[in-house]
Every structure is written in structure tokens, then in C-alpha cells.
Design a protein with these regions (language model features):
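Signature for phosphate-centric chemistry
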Residues: 19-151, 155-325, 329-427
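Bacterial Sec-dependent N-terminal signal peptides
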Residues: 1-22
Length: 427
């Protein structure tokens, strides 16, 4: 009985940890409150352990799509606008001592941002170097040997190209004999970076209605106001509280993209931090996920990319391709791809945005800065069946076909599933 009780406690502990809420995750790691601005989870967290492949199977090919690493904010107004609002409050003597300090720090940050808007940071470069190092450590068979060829393609945006080059540098250090074909050309953007007029219109309508309503419902700035302003009535009557709070939250969230000690998380209590994540999570689900609000349309933006992944894998399996196809782009491309491929719970449909938080559709698990999806292909000398494993941010995820060897899946079954899905979409 004693041993049974101990085992039960261990089971409950594991289950509780596996089902940890976003609220609890944010309490333990405030970076997660940044949502899509969250930096890559390692080395803050322990890198997940990988399940050994079935006996006799060895990795031979990798197919990948990754988001650029941590960056500066992509609009100068994200730095200047909150300064202007705080200067107005300061002019009337309405800032607290902490508010005055924040204004000073924001001015310093804005000066540092000059000429670097949207660019990769030192943190972002380091993320990709370490990702590549773990690729070669986890799957040396793919990258070892004198005839290894790696094809890398990037969005034409500089931060993506530099993310690619930081990984390439580490791959070449692991195997100086490998051939790396690196390219960032408009010729590949038809499948690497995507969007269309329908998606833009659906997003515009959702922002104006459902997302706006969700944001307003979860906007409770009391603690923030008390930290920043000495006159609550002035702040409510004379300032755009929603705008200033959201602007400072953006900067706060993105400070983890820099090697800096400056932090503004103390301006927000636990509820405000959580609601920032909640709003961002809902935003991404609607504008790039399978949300009914946007007609379930957004994942289909990734169809050309998925087709490229299938075709590239066919070539590699037939011995006519390369050892690895690495693609570097953006969060707005990675999110639809993961949803289209139905990895983990990211293909699930939720009719009520309030249900998202209790699910496992969490944006910080999907697209942090430096986020990436890796498909690892395995073969055995004793079987013709190719197996594949999906890693999202180096964590094993389920795939949408049955398997007795999960997280390893039959590529034949997966390929047929995805081909059928792409064909059905054409009708």
C-alpha cells in the first residue's frame, strides 16, 4: 500500500506539471507574459529530452521552418509614442517617481533603437547559434560526412537572413566539409512568406470587432496606473490609458530580446501580466490560427510551404535531394504552417476565445522569438517504412495520423494525409 501511495503521488505530480496553466507558467517565468515577444525558451528552461528512435532507425534528413531570432521592435512609433504620452503627464506633474524613471529609461531605449528598427539583436543571433549546435548534437548523422549538402533559404528581410547565417556558421563549424547553399531571394517568397487579400480583410474585420471586444474585456489597468501616475483622474480623463499601457507592455515584453538589466515588469501585477498574454494568445489564434472568426482560413496560407516540404522530402528520400532543408521566415508564416499540419493541439478549433487559455493552444509554445519546427526523417536497413518525428521548439509533438511508435510516425501515412488535405482545399 505504501508503494502504491507513493506511485500515486508521483503520477499526480507529473499530471499536474503536464497540465500547468498559463497563469502558473507566467508566475514561474514572467517572460511568457510577453506572448509572441517571448524569447526562445532555452537556456531559461531545460531542453526537453528526446524519445529514442525505434530499434534500427537512424536520422538521415531534416526539414525545417524557423522564425527569426529576437529583434528590435519593428516600428519607430512603438518607442516614440509612449514617450510622448508620458511627457504630457510629466508636464502637468502627474508622474510618480517610478513613472519619471520609466520615462528616462524609455528615452534611452529609443536612442539605442535608432537605425536598428526590426533588426536582429545579439540575443537573437545567439539563439540561432545554440539551436544549430543542438541540431548537430541531437542528429549528428544528418550533418556528418564529406558529402553533406544543406540547403538554406531565408525571407529577404535582413533579420531572417542573419538568423540563417548564424545557424549556418555553427553547422559549418561542426562539419567544415559540408556544402551549404544559402539564399535569400524574392524567387522563393511565393512559398516562404505569404498572405493574401482575403486574409488581410478577415484580419481587419476581426481586429475591429471580436478582438477589440476581447481586449476591452480583459483590460484592467489599475495597478499600472497606480505605479505610473499620481493622479488617477487625470490619467483616465486626459490620457489614452489603453494605448499607453499596451505600448509599454510591448516594450516590456521585448526587453527580453536584449542583453539588458532594464525591466518594466514591476509596473504590472499578476493579473495584468496574465491578461497581456491572454489577449496576445487570442490575437494569434484569430489572425493566423484555425479560428472560426476568420473562417478557419488562415492555416491554408501555408499550403505552398507544406507542399514544398512534401516535395523536398520526396527528393531526399529518393536520394536526389539534400541532407537538410532549412527555411527562415516569420511568425506569421510559422503559425499557419503548424496549424495546417495539425501538430499537437494547434490544429484544434475553438468557438469561444475564452476557451483558449484552458487548452494547450498557447502562443508561447508555438512562436517565441527563434521558434522553429523540425521534421526529422528516419530510415532502417530492415524496413522500407520511413519514420518522421516533429519537433516544435525542440519539443516532440503529436502528428495527425495513428501510430504505435509515437512520437515517430509513418511518413507514408503522413504524406498521404497531407496530400489529401491539400487536394481537398483546392475543391
Amino acid at each position: 500500500r505504501k508503494y502504491t501511495y507513493i506511485l500515486l503521488l508521483l503520477f499526480l505530480a507529473v499530471s499536474t506539471n503536464a497540465q500547468k496553466s498559463a497563469w502558473d507558467e507566467i508566475k514561474e517565468d514572467v517572460c511568457i507574459a510577453g506572448g509572441g515577444y517571448c524569447s526562445y525558451p532555452y537556456p531559461r528552461h531545460e531542453v526537453p529530452k528526446l524519445t529514442p528512435a525505434p530499434k534500427g532507425y537512424k536520422p538521415f534528413y531534416m526539414s525545417h521552418y524557423g522564425r527569426h531570432g529576437s529583434r528590435w521592435l519593428h516600428d519607430p512609433a512603438q518607442y516614440s509614442n509612449p514617450i510622448q504620452v508620458l511627457e504630457k503627464a510629466d508636464k502637468y506633474g502627474k508622474l510618480t517617481a517610478r513613472g519619471k524613471e520609466v520615462l528616462k529609461q524609455l528615452r534611452e531605449i529609443e536612442v539605442s533603437s535608432k537605425g536598428r528598427i526590426g533588426e536582429l539583436t545579439t540575443v537573437g543571433a545567439r539563439q540561432h547559434q545554440e539551436i544549430a549546435q543542438r541540431m548537430t548534437k541531437n542528429f549528428p548523422e544528418i550533418f556528418r560526412g564529406k558529402n553533406v549538402i544543406v540547403d538554406t533559404k531565408s525571407s529577404t528581410v535582413m533579420r531572417c537572413a542573419l538568423s540563417m547565417l548564424n545557424e549556418v556558421k555553427e553547422l559549418e563549424a561542426f562539419n567544415p566539409r559540408m556544402t551549404v547553399n544559402a539564399d535569400a531571394s524574392g524567387a522563393d517568397m511565393w512559398y516562404m512568406v505569404y498572405g493574401d487579400s482575403k486574409a488581410a480583410q478577415l484580419e481587419k474585420e476581426a481586429r475591429a470587432k471580436e478582438l477589440k471586444a476581447f481586449d476591452e474585456k480583459h483590460f484592467h489597468p489599475d495597478y499600472f496606473v497606480s505605479k505610473m501616475f499620481n493622479d488617477r483622474q487625470f490619467a483616465q480623463d486626459s490620457l489614452d490609458l489603453h494605448g499607453i499601457m499596451r505600448a509599454i507592455l510591448d516594450i516590456t515584453s521585448n526587453q527580453q530580446s536584449h542583453d539588458t538589466e532594464i525591466s518594466f515588469w514591476d509596473l504590472f501585477d499578476e493579473q495584468e501580466r496574465y491578461e497581456n498574454w491572454l489577449i496576445d494568445n487570442a490575437f494569434w489564434y484569430v489572425v493566423r490560427g484555425p479560428s472560426p472568426i476568420t473562417e478557419g482560413y488562415m492555416p491554408h496560407l501555408a499550403e505552398n510551404l507544406l507542399n514544398n516540404i512534401l516535395e523536398s522530402a520526396d527528393k531526399a528520400i529518393a536520394g536526389k535531394g539534400v541532407n537538410a532543408n532549412l527555411r527562415f521566415g516569420h511568425d506569421a508564416c510559422l503559425v499557419p504552417l503548424v496549424c495546417l499540419m495539425e501538430l499537437g493541439d494547434f490544429g484544434k478549433v475553438f468557438n469561444d476565445l475564452e476557451d483558449l487559455a484552458a487548452s494547450r493552444w498557447h502562443i508561447h509554445d508555438l512562436t517565441t522569438m527563434g521558434a522553429n519546427m523540425q521534421l526529422i526523417f528516419y530510415r532502417s536497413k530492415k524496413s522500407d517504412d520511413i519514420l518522421v518525428k516533429a519537433l516544435l521548439n525542440e519539443k516532440e509533438l503529436s502528428m495527425p495520423v495513428p501510430s504505435e511508435t509515437a512520437p515517430y510516425y509513418s511518413w507514408k501515412a503522413l504524406r498521404a494525409y497531407y496530400k489529401s488535405k491539400l487536394e481537398a482545399s483546392k475543391k
